[in-house]
UniProtKB/Swiss-Prot annotation:
CDD domains: Wnt_Wnt10b (cd19356). It comes from Mus musculus. Disulfide bonds join C83-C94, C136-C144, C146-C199, C247-C261, C249-C256, C318-C349, C334-C344, C348-C388, C364-C379, C366-C376, C371-C372. Coiled coil: none annotated. Forms a soluble 1:1 complex with AFM; this prevents oligomerization and is required for prolonged biological activity. The complex with AFM may represent the physiological form in body fluids. GO terms for cellular component: extracellular region. Member of the Wnt ligand gene family that encodes for secreted proteins, which activate the Wnt signaling cascade. Specifically activates canonical Wnt/beta-catenin signaling and thus triggers beta-catenin/LEF/TCF-mediated transcriptional programs. Involved in signaling networks controlling stemness, pluripotency and cell fate decisions. Acts in the immune system, mammary gland, adipose tissue, bone and skin. This is Protein Wnt-10b. The lineage of its organism: Eukaryota, Metazoa, Chordata, Craniata, Vertebrata. Residues 1-28 form the signal peptide. Belongs to the Wnt family. Keywords: Developmental protein, Disulfide bond, Extracellular matrix, Glycoprotein, Lipoprotein, Phosphoprotein, Secreted, Signal, Wnt signaling pathway.
Length: 389
C-alpha cells in the first residue's frame, strides 16, 4: 500500500557528497571523453575537510587531488552497496561497513582476519579503482583523462577522415590495431573493420590511486596488514581481468561499416559477482608467528596470488558483537519457505521468527539539484514480513 509522498530534503551527508562527485551533470560523450566547461571544481574544503576518519596520508592525497578523492569515496560507497547485494542472504551482510560519515575501514571486522574481511577489502579496493578509472574516462578529473592511445592524435584524425571518405563512396577502408593489453580485451574477428579509439578507461591511473589511497607505503609488519594488502591487490586484479571492449558503429543507415572501439571496465555488478565467487574458495593461511606476518600457504605462490586469503575462522555472526563487527541477525527479514541461507531456519540461528505487519519509510523520486544536494520524497510502504527473533 503506497501513501502520498511527503516532500522532505534529506541531509547531504556522505552519500550526498558522493553523488556530487560523479553525478552532478549528464554523462559526457564516452567516445570523445569531453570535458564540458561550467562545472565548479571540487575543492579540499568540499571534500577533504568534511569527511572524518582520513589518515594523515589519505588527507595529503585528498588535499593534492580532491576531485580524484571524491571519485574514490564514490567507489567506496558503491562497493559497500555491492557487498550488501552479494551477501544479502548471509548472516553477515556487509551492513557493518556503513560508517555514518566515516570510511568503511573503521569497521571492526576489517581489523580481523575473517573470510568476510578478505572479501570486504577486495571489494573496497576494486570500487576505488573502478570509480576513479570511470571518472577519468568521463573527463571529470583534472589529473587524468583518456587511457592508452593507439596512435597520435594527428594520425588518428587523418585515418578517420580517410575512412569516412571511403564510407561515403560505399567502400570499406580497414584500419585495425592490436589490443594495448594482450589478453585483457577480446580480439576482433577477421571480418571486423575497427580501430582503437575514443576514450579508454584509464585503469592504470585508477589502480595506482587505489593502491596509494588504501595500501600502506610501509612494508607490512603483521599478518593482518599482509592479508589486507594481498586482498586489495586481488580486488584490483579482478577489475583488470574483466575489462571489456566497447564499440560504436559508424556508417550509412546504421550499417556499422566501421567501428570505433575502446577499453572499458564492466558494470560493477560483474566485479562483485567475480569476487563473490572467489569468496567461496578463499584460502585459509596458517602462520608461524602472526606478529611476523609469515605466510605458510599450502598452495604455490602463483595459485595464491589471485585468490582471497584469510587467517581467522569466522564466528557464526548470530549475535550482535561490536568487537567482531557483527550486527547479529535479530530483526533481519527472512524467507520462511526457503531452505537455503536466506531461510528463517538458517538466518535466525534457531531462534525462530515473527510475522509482522511492517510499515517502512523509504526514499523515493530522488532528484539531484546543483548545487549541492539530493532532494527525495518519503514514501510509506506497508507489508507483511518474516523477521528473526
Amino acid at each position: 500500500m503506497l501513501e502520498e509522498p511527503r516532500s522532505r530534503p534529506p541531509p547531504l551527508g556522505l552519500a550526498g557528497l558522493l553523488f556530487l562527485a560523479l553525478f552532478s551533470r549528464a554523462l559526457s560523450n564516452e567516445i570523445l571523453g569531453l570535458k564540458l566547461p561550467g562545472e565548479p571544481p571540487l575543492t579540499a574544503n568540499t571534500v577533504c575537510l568534511t569527511l572524518s576518519g582520513l589518515s594523515k596520508r589519505q588527507l595529503g592525497l585528498c588535499l593534492r587531488s580532491p576531485d580524484v578523492t571524491a571519485s574514490a569515496l564514490q567507489g567506496l560507497h558503491i562497493a559497500v552497496h555491492e557487498c550488501q547485494h552479494q551477501l544479502r542472504d548471509q548472516r553477515w551482510n556487509c551492513s557493518a561497513l556503513e560508517g555514518g560519515g566515516r570510511l568503511p575501514h573503521h569497521s571492526a571486522i576489517l581489523k580481523r582476519g575473517f573470510r568476510e574481511s578478505a572479501f570486504s577489502f577486495s571489494m573496497l579496493a576494486a570500487g576505488v579503482m573502478h570509480a576513479v578509472a570511470t571518472a577519468c574516462s568521463l573527463g571529470k578529473l583534472v589529473s587524468c583523462g583518456c587511457g592508452w592511445k593507439g596512435s597520435g592524435e594527428q594520425d588518428r584524425l587523418r585515418a578517420k577522415l580517410l575512412q569516412l571518405q571511403a564510407l561515403s563512396r560505399g567502400k570499406t577502408f580497414p584500419i585495425s590495431q592490436p589490443s594495448p593489453v594482450p589478453g585483457s580485451v577480446p580480439s576482433p574477428g577477421p571480418q571486423d573493420t575497427w580501430e582503437w579509439g575514443g576514450c579508454n578507461h584509464d585503469m592504470d591511473f585508477g589502480e595506482k590511486f587505489s593502491r596509494d589511497f588504501l595500501d600502506s607505503r610501509e612494508a607490512p609488519r603483521d599478518i593482518q596488514a599482509r592479508m589486507r594488502i594481498h586482498n586489495n591487490r586481488v580486488g584490483r586484479q579482478v577489475v583488470t581481468e574483466n575489462l571489456k571492449r566497447k564499440c560504436k558503429c559508424h556508417g550509412t543507415s546504421g550499417s556499422c561499416q566501421f567501428k570505433t572501439c575502446w577499453r572499458a571496465a564492466p558494470e560493477f555488478r560483474a566485479i562483485g559477482a567475480a569476487l563473490r565467487e572467489r569468496l567461496s574458495r578463499a584460502i585459509f593461511i596458517d602462520t608461524h608467528n602472526r606478529n611476523s606476518g609469515a605466510f605458510q600457504p599450502r598452495l604455490r605462490p602463483r595459485r595464491l596470488s589471485g585468490e582471497l586469503v584469510y587467517f581467522e575462522k569466522s564466528p557464526d555472526f548470530c549475535e550482535r558483537d561490536p568487537t567482531l563487527g557483527s550486527p547479529g541477525t535479530r530483526g533481519r527479514a527472512c524467507n520462511k519457505t526457503s531452505r537455503l541461507l536466506d531461510g528463517c531456519g538458517s538466518l535466525c540461528c534457531g531462534r525462530g521468527h515473527n510475522v509482522l505487519r511492517q510499515t517502512r519509510v523509504e526514499r523515493c523520486h530522488c532528484r539531484f539539484h546543483w548545487c549541492c544536494y539530493v532532494l527525495c520524497d518519503e514514501c510509506k510502504v506497508t507489508e507483511w514480513v518474516n523477521v528473526c527473533k
